[in-house]
Regions:
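Residues that form or immediately flank small-molecule/cofactor binding pockets and catalytic motifs
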Residues: 24, 103, 132, 212-214
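A generic structural signal for alpha->beta connector loops
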Residues: 93-95, 122-124, 177, 204-206, ...
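Alpha-helical subdomain
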Residues: 161, 186-193, 199, 214, ...
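A short, flexible beta-alpha/helix-coil linker loop
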Residues: 36-40, 152-155, 180, 187
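Rossmann-like AdoMet
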Residues: 1-67, 89-92, 123
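SAM/dcSAM-binding transferase cores
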Residues: 2-23, 38-44, 217-286
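C-terminal substrate-binding/active-site "lid" region of AdoMet-derived donor-dependent transferases
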Residues: 165-235
Length: 286
């Protein structure tokens, strides 16, 4: 008889992290930081994406290249490495680097939820501790197919990762036709999301925004996905995937995105601020 998995917790650089087993799904774990959900990982089936925002990032990655084709990916923000594990399973041979600022958090995840490291050819997942922007600035130009920014200090995206200067660093790291994707969160009146869309539009000629209809209408707080590229994004395929998901979402691009942005100006380092805090109880769990 095997021991049942039990929750584990540890004080990290950014708060108190807790790994809790999902009693309804063998091999699945929830990572929280100060009570705010950060990641959900299924060790038995890494293609299972529980959270709505990870499913949207998964759909985006699925649509960017033919099925199974390896990608060179930089993940800014690690958590429990949900998306890196997904891509390792769906696109074997991908070279992935994860940058997580919270070293003790990364150690906790490595100890209890280990992942496949890189092989001699560099395929696999390499995780390092560091600041996302510093790591991005040190990358060789044109070295990545996909850059994913999913950085939350607790429940807020740090200001220095929200500016035109930051997005330009991401653009420089991408190969021609590569994609930059940012997972953000905002609520009524969507001032932060509009400004972030304006920021990505100032750098990339092709941009789309994805969110639940209720979030787009300014009725509630929720996740917002922004994607930018130098090449046309597969918008029709993505719109179909997002609309048909168990967490349906709308894709906004072109003139509709311009109308949503309105007069919002791109954010610069000089005026950047952290993303707005969620309303009380928006994401907290025990």
């Amino acid at each position: 008889m095997t021991d049942e998995p039990v929750p584990v917790g540890r004080r990290t650089d950014l708060g108190f992290a807790k790994l809790m087993p999902d009693i309804d799904r063998d091999g699945a774990w929830l990572l929280t930081l100060d009570g705010t959900p950060q990641s959900y990982v299924d060790l038995a089936d890494p293609t299972h994406l529980e959270f709505e925002y990870t499913r949207r990032l998964g759909h985006l990655a699925d649509a960017l290249a033919p099925a199974g084709q390896p990608l060179d990916v930089l993940h800014l923000g690690g958590g429990a490495l949900t998306l890196p594990r997904y891509l390792a399973a769906t696109r074997p041979g991908s070279r992935q680097r994860v940058v997580e600022v919270d070293g003790p958090l990364l150690e906790l995840v490595a100890e209890h939820l280990p992942w496949p490291g890189p092989d001699p050819d560099g395929a696999g997942i390499a995780a390092t501790v560091g600041d996302a922007r510093v790591a991005l600035s040190e990358l060789p130009s044109g070295s990545r197919d996909l850059v994913i920014a999913d950085v939350f200090h607790g429940s807020r995206t740090p200001a220095h990762l929200t500016s035109v200067e930051f997005v330009r660093l991401a653009a420089a790291a991408l190969r021609e036709g590569g994609c930059y994707a940012a997972n953000l969160a905002d609520g009524p009146p969507l001032a932060f999301a509009r400004a972030q869309a304006a920021t990505v539009r100032a750098v990339f000629p092709y941009v789309c925004l994805v969110a639940e209809a209720s979030v787009l209408r300014g009725r509630r707080y929720g996740n917002v996905l922004l994607a930018g590229s130098t090449a046309p994004l597969p918008a029709a395929e993505l719109a179909r995937l997002f609309a048909g998901d168990i967490f349906p979402a709308r894709l906004v691009e072109g003139e509709d995105l311009a109308a949503l942005v309105g007069r919002a100006a791109p954010v610069t380092d000089a005026d950047a601020t952290d993303s707005p805090p969620p309303p009380d109880g928006a994401f907290s769990v025990g």
